[in-house]
Structures are given as C-alpha cells and as structure tokens.
From Swiss-Prot:
Gene3D superfamilies named among the record's database cross-references: Peptidase S8/S53 domain (3.40.50.200)
GO biological process terms, semicolon-separated: proteolysis
Stored Pfam families: Peptidase_S8
InterPro entries: Peptidase_S8/S53_dom (IPR000209), Peptidase_S8/S53_dom_sf (IPR036852), Peptidase_S8/S53_subtilisin (IPR051048), Peptidase_S8_Asp-AS (IPR023827), Peptidase_S8_His-AS (IPR022398), Peptidase_S8_Ser-AS (IPR023828), Peptidase_S8_subtilisin-rel (IPR015500), Subtilisin_Carlsberg-like (IPR034202)
Domain Peptidase S8: 22-311
Record keywords, A-Z: Hydrolase, Protease, Serine protease
Protein name as it appears in the record: Intracellular alkaline protease
Source organism per UniProt: Shouchella clausii
Family: Belongs to the peptidase S8 family.
GO molecular function, one term: serine-type endopeptidase activity
Phosphoprotein listed as a keyword: no
PANTHER family assigned: CELL WALL-ASSOCIATED PROTEASE (PTHR43399:SF4), SUBTILISIN-RELATED (PTHR43399)
Enzyme Commission (EC) number: 3.4.21.-
Length: 321
C-alpha cells in the first residue's frame, strides 16, 4: 500500500501571539489587489492536509466545513481536527481572516473547506488523497457553492494512475490543483527531483524562495515547476490558537492557492465572465516575475500579484503624455 506524506518542512519558531501581515503575504503583493479582488470573497479553497484547528481565532470565521477521510478519530468523518499542525499553518497562509490581531492570509475573505487526508503522523494512503481530490470536486454547498481551488502540500515518490486520474478529473471540472513541489532538492539546477502529484503536468507545482527572492537549497527542481512563492520563515496559524514559523515548499504552495482566489475574482471582473481553469492558470502566469534562475528552478517566475496593474498603470501614464 503506497503512502503519501507531508512534504518535509522545518519548524523555525513557535509563538503564542502575533499581530502582523506576514512578510510572505506582503511580498507577493496580495494587499495591492485586495480591494479589486474583494479579498477573495465568494471563493472556496479545499485544503487537503492534516486537518485544521477549526476554532483558531484567525480561522474560525473562514472555515465553512470539512471532512475526515483518514482513520484518525476512529474514522469519524465529521472530526477533521488537526493533530499535527501542518494543516492549520497552511490554512492560515491561504485565508486567515483580518481580526485586528494574529496573522492575515493571502485571501482573507475566501472560505476554506478542510479535507483531512493525512493522519497526525503526517502520512496518508494514496487512496485517501485521490478520494479527497474527488470529494472536493463533487462537493456542493447548500446554495450550490463549489470549490474552484485545491491546495496540497503533500507528496510521494511514485506515480499513481489513480491519483493522476483524480487530478485530471479536478482540472476537467475547472478546479485548479496547487501542489508543493517537494523538498528533496540537492541545490543543483541540472538534476531533477520529482514528487507526486506536483510532477503531473495538470498541477500548478510551486517551488520556494526566501524573502530576498533567493532560491533555497531544499526545493525540488524539474521541468514541471510552474511558479515560486515565499517558503522560508513563513509565519502562520498553528495549534493551540498559536502561531509558528515554518519553512518548505509546503509553505509556498498556499500563497499560490490564496492568490488564485484573488485572481479568479479579478478575472471575472475584467472579462465579465467566469474563466476556465486553463484561463485562470494563464492569468496566474501573467503575474509571475522572472528572477534570474532557470525554468527548472523557478518555473515562470515569482508570484507577484500586483504586476499586471503596475504595468497597466505605466502604459496608461505614457498614453496621457
């Protein structure tokens, strides 16, 4: 039976209280597009991970539901509490609410649906992950709401037809699948390290850089990397209503998931229609800044949400002269 695990990560620090917009949220320029994107309101992101502390003060108002697909808690589906910490951290980066204290996520008015597909020890069966993806796609809220985005900071070393089919099912139903690229890198650009599902072409695979936009030595490098985001020293929500600073591509991926919620709203306003998953990916690529590394390292570049508006503004000013 094939096992999938959390993408390995490093815990740097743990604190009981914070009050800030995390640096990662700032440098991807999320605040620059919050007004135009309604801070992600109306979008639902499925977080497939170790669960979540549902009563965390920064997350409680953003979590609209969840399910447990593991054998933890006796397999009770309604108990999707986090018994690891990883899932709570990921959820906070995606959409921690603006409460006046604590931290703020990339899309602070987007909603979260928690899918516990990893046990407290960070492992999960491949079937749980595939089922979680299909569950997210098929879920409907009381008013017909649907998830448009799935984020997964997990992976395994081997390809799986069942898992790949689940990913393709999601994308064919206009659900974007965001995955951490993996932390098995050797610091070299000319070697490939793959983790699945991030290695599937249909997935948005996310690598990691630090706050100075320097590549870390831990991320996987390969030709399937799509974009990079902050993944070193990321502060977010954690167990016991606290906060932690973690590092890894696990921390980079949720920046992109939150960004997609903002981009979907921006695109709908700009195009006056709902864009397909492929079109949304194209809009994401438009907001990637080249940072001087090979495509194996950084894909299309660094996530820069305010890039399009900044360029548009420059041309608008030129046109007025």
């Amino acid at each position: 039976m094939r096992k999938f695990r959390l993408i390995p990560y490093k815990q740097v620090d743990k604190v009981s209280a914070l009050s800030e917009v995390p640096m990662g949220v700032e440098i991807v320029e999320a605040p620059a597009v919050w007004k135009a994107s309604a801070k992600g309101a109306g979008q639902i992101i499925g977080v497939i991970d170790t669960g979540c502390q549902v009563d965390h003060p920064d997350l409680a108002e953003r979590i609209i539901g969840g399910v447990n697909l593991t054998t933890d808690y006796g397999g009770v589906e309604t108990n999707f509490s986090d018994n690891n910490g990883h899932g709570t951290h990921v959820a906070g980066t995606v959409a921690a609410a603006e409460t006046g204290s604590g931290v703020v996520g990339v899309a602070p008015k987007a909603d979260l649906f928690i899918i516990k597909a990893l046990s407290g020890d960070g492992s999960g069966e491949m079937g749980w992950i595939a089922k979680a993806i299909r569950y997210a796609v098929d879920w409907r809220g009381p008013k017909g709401e649907q998830m448009r985005i799935i984020t997964m900071s997990l992976g395994g070393p081997t390809d799986s037809e069942e898992l790949h089919d689940a990913v393709k099912y999601a994308v064919s139903n206009n659900v974007s699948v965001v995955c951490a690229a993996g932390n098995e890198g050797d610091g070299r650009e000319d070697t490939n390290e793959f983790a699945y599902p991030a290695a599937y072409n249909e997935v948005i695979a996310v690598g990691a850089v630090d706050f100075d936009l320097r590549l870390s030595d831990f991320p996987n490098t390969n030709e399937e990397i799509d974009i990079v985001a902050p993944g070193v020293g990321i502060k977010s929500t954690y167990l016991d209503s606290g906060y932690a600073e973690l590092s890894g591509t696990s921390m980079a991926a949720p920046h992109v998931a939150g960004a997609l919620a903002l981009i979907i709203n921006l695109a709908k306003d700009a195009f006056k229609r709902t864009l397909s998953e492929t079109e949304i990916c194209a809009q994401l690529v438009r907001r990637a800044t080249p940072i001087g590394f090979t495509a194996q390292d950084k894909g299309n570049g660094f996530l820069t949400l305010g890039l399009v508006e900044r360029i548009t503004g420059q041309f608008t000013e030129k046109g007025k002269k």
